[in-house]
C-alpha cells in the first residue's frame, strides 16, 4: 500500500523526469543537432549531469510504481519494474563518464569523445529495456491515469521498442531522426510522465 508521502514523492519524481527529459532532447536535437558527435566542451557537463538526474528521477518513479499499482500477483509488472530500475542505474553511471574522462588528472586510452559516443549509442538500449515498464504501467494504471494516459503510455512503450529495434538492425532512415525524436521525445514521453504524475496525485 502506497502512503500519501510516497505518492507526493512519486509525483515530484515524475515532474523532474519530465522537465529534464524535455531539456535534454531540446539541447541534443536542436542545439547540438543530429550530426553532433563526441564530447561537447560547453554542453557536455550540463548534458551529463542532466541525464544522470533524469535517470535518477525515473528510477524513483519506477521504484514507487510497484506500490502505487500494487504489483503483488502481477509478475510482468514486477519484472518490468526490476528491469527498468536496473537499466536506469546503468544510465545514471554512464551519463557521467564522458565528463569524468574529460576532466581526468591523467591521460587515458579512452577519450571523452569516445565515451560520449558510447553513451549516445547505449542510451537506445537503455530505453528499449524501459519500454516494457511503460506498457505495464499503462495496463495496470488505467484506472488512475488520465483518460488519454494509457494510449500515450502504450504508444511510448511500443514506439520506443520498435524504433530502437529498427535502429539496432541498421534500418533506421536518417531523415526520420528529428521527426521521431520530436514525436517520441519532445511530445509523447513528457506527456506520458505528466500522465504518470497525475496517477500519483490521484
Q: What residue spans do the PLM features occupy?
A:
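Hydrophobic, aromatic-enriched alpha-helical segments typical of multi-pass transmembrane helices
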Residues: 1-202
Amino acid at each position: 500500500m502506497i502512503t500519501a508521502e510516497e505518492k507526493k514523492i512519486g509525483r515530484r519524481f515524475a515532474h523532474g523526469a519530465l522537465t529534464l527529459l524535455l531539456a535534454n532532447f531540446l539541447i541534443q536535437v536542436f542545439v547540438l543537432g543530429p550530426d553532433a558527435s563526441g564530447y561537447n566542451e560547453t554542453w557536455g557537463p550540463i548534458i551529463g549531469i542532466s541525464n544522470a538526474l533524469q535517470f535518477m528521477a525515473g528510477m524513483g518513479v519506477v521504484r514507487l510504481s510497484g506500490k502505487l499499482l500494487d504489483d503483488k500477483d502481477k509478475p510482468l509488472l514486477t519484472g518490468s519494474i526490476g528491469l527498468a530500475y536496473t537499466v536506469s542505474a546503468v544510465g545514471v553511471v554512464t551519463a557521467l563518464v564522458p565528463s569524468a574522462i574529460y576532466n581526468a588528472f591523467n591521460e587515458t586510452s579512452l577519450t571523452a569523445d569516445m565515451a560520449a559516443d558510447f553513451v549516445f549509442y547505449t542510451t537506445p538500449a537503455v530505453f528499449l529495456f524501459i519500454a516494457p515498464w511503460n506498457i505495464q504501467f499503462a495496463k495496470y494504471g488505467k484506472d488512475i491515469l488520465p483518460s488519454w494516459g494509457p494510449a500515450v503510455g502504450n504508444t511510448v512503450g511500443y514506439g520506443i521498442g520498435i524504433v530502437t529495434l529498427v535502429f539496432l538492425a541498421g534500418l533506421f532512415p536518417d531523415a526520420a531522426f528529428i521527426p521521431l525524436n520530436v514525436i517520441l521525445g519532445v511530445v509523447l514521453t513528457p506527456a506520458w510522465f505528466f500522465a504518470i504524475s497525475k496517477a500519483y496525485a490521484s
